[in-house]
A protein has these predicted regions:
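Accessory alpha-helical/coil subdomains and C-terminal extensions
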Residues: 1-15, 133-202
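Conserved beta-strand scaffold positions in the cores of enzyme catalytic domains, especially
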Residues: 21-25, 83, 125, 199-201
Length: 202
């Protein structure tokens, strides 16, 4: 609702009345406070609404957007529809916000290449001009609109006047979707292992 208020032309830029949009609020908190419980609730909301929509878009704060992209990638088992996660560097309603642009880009990717059936599938991040696998989202800057990049692999595609998808990278992304993993554990730690590390510490 806030995006439409600040940018009434958003839907007309992405298909207008041909696109039906419904909103579900899973939580409203600073993304720095996102936890595995929220990931479970978000994944559950996606599953509950999965059959009713052609694509699902998640709006998320940037601090932990990459973590949520990875969590959803492993929590959702072999999704055949696009689950697109995006956010903004500048909040909606402030001057020079990129919120409307990123949502427009997310919709364009979700319906790519146009027509009745999207060829995009699985969890992807859309931010600035980059389309990134959900497992590869890394925030690299707090200042530029292209805030996220794909680490250890290239982006699936780029967005400009057209949505340009690398078909080989998209095919590889789709082949990586099936996981069937359990919900994420709620007690986690990141341990950096060095020579002579005592395993009893873990």
């Amino acid at each position: 609702a806030s995006v439409k208020r600040h940018n009434p032309g958003l839907l007309s830029n992405t298909g207008g009345s041909r696109i039906r949009v419904e909103l579900r609020e899973v939580c409203n908190l600073d993304s720095s406070n996102i936890s595995p419980i929220v990931w479970e609730n978000l994944a559950g909301t996606i599953r509950d609404n999965y059959d009713d929509f052609d694509a699902l878009i998640v709006l998320h704060g940037t601090n932990t957007l990459g973590y949520t992209g990875a969590a959803l990638s492993f929590a959702l088992v072999n999704p055949t529809k696009p689950v697109v996660i995006t956010g903004s560097q500048v909040p909606s309603g402030l001057p020079a916000t990129d919120a409307a642009m990123n949502i427009e880009h997310a919709v364009r990717v979700a319906v790519w290449p146009g027509g009745d059936i999207s060829r995009m599938a699985g969890v992807v991040g859309v931010f600035g001009s980059h389309i990134i696998p959900g497992t590869r989202l890394k925030k690299t800057t707090s200042f530029d609109y292209d805030a996220f990049r794909s680490f250890s692999s290239e982006s699936i595609g780029r967005i400009g006047r057209l949505v340009n998808i690398d078909e080989d990278k998209l095919s590889k992304h789709k082949s990586y979707l099936h996981t069937g993993l359990n919900p994420p554990a709620r007690r986690q730690a990141d341990l950096r292992v060095e020579p002579e590390f005592d395993a009893r510490i873990a």
